[in-house]
Amino acid sequence: LDLPDSAIDSFKKAIWRVIEANTEAFAPHVLSHANSLQRIRNRGIDCRTVIDVGASDGRWSQMARSFWPDAHYHLVEAFEHWNGALQALTADDPRMTFTLAAAGAEDGETPFTNSFDDPFGGTAMPDAGAPQWTVRQVSLDQEVERLGFEGPFMVKLDTHGTEREILAGARRVLESCEVLVIEMYNYGEDSRRFPAMCQHVESLGFHCIDMGEPMFRDHDRAFWQVDFFFVRKDRPEAVYPQFR
């Protein structure tokens, strides 16, 4: 089909008018994780081991694998609801493993809250409310040492409030970490909201380089959460201060 340039331009403008009129609906797709990871991969950043914390059924790791196909993917998930899906995903794949546990500052146990009505909403925050039970907890440093994983690492956290504790238990991993992907929030305790969390992650030696999938809450369409992508502070993208 051979269309004139004027028709193609009109079509593009019409599409953008639709997107601009429905920014909340389209933002997570335009600013998708896949697009962010593609940009990071295009920068030549390599990862040997990807640690996916809050992995649910493994869909994020499967998506990331299209950009780092030779990496080993280790999934950490606390909610036993996902055990069957993770077993099926990793059964015949030596480059994909999982641990059924929460991640935290140290090995042990932790309270955990989730609901089968919302299996993507789990948290190990102790004041999260019912239903709550005790699950195994691992630190990423100990997990990596136990399983013999090697960097460079990518670490992704979708953990609903326990990011500081998980990072505290990953000091050695962070020394060899090239990419951090962290879901951050606009509500809750100030120290766990995205402004303070971005400062905290920068204090650990990283610089925010991308973002993805902003979400607006149902209650009043206020900004709720977004995923930030961090690289090491000494990378060229982090050091260069100009727009052009």
Predicted regions: what is each one?
Residues 1-244:
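Phosphate/nucleotide-binding beta-alpha loop and adjacent structural elements of enzyme active sites
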